[in-house]
Amino acid sequence: MTGASILEGCSKNGGSTPATVSVNFTLDLNASSNSALKTVGGYVESNNAIVIRTTTNTYIALSNVCTHQGCTVSYSSQAKDIYCPCHGGTYDLNGNVTGGPPPSALQVFKTSLNGNILTVTS
């Protein structure tokens, strides 16, 4: 393994930026496992994504993998932000870094609603 291969993916602060993730899944909003999405501010975690209902008609989906060192991030409905427990990184609901060591934004996925089926794709 070459030195370049070892350093590939490392950021200037010693973290690593996870590779872009490809997702393509659906959530049935009538399923009990997705009942949190019936309420504005509700969220579910599925398929390496956090899916949040932000308004009556709007859902967002972001990667749940921190861009610093790959830890799993969590959504705080009270703070309305996304938090990494490993080193305190924070992101807004657009995936942008708002604090801490993450070197880049979270990957944002597309959402589309057809009846009670929410589709999430990269």
Which residues make up each language-model segment?
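Short cysteine/histidine-rich metal-coordination sites, predominantly Zn2+-binding motifs
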Residues: 80-88, 98-106
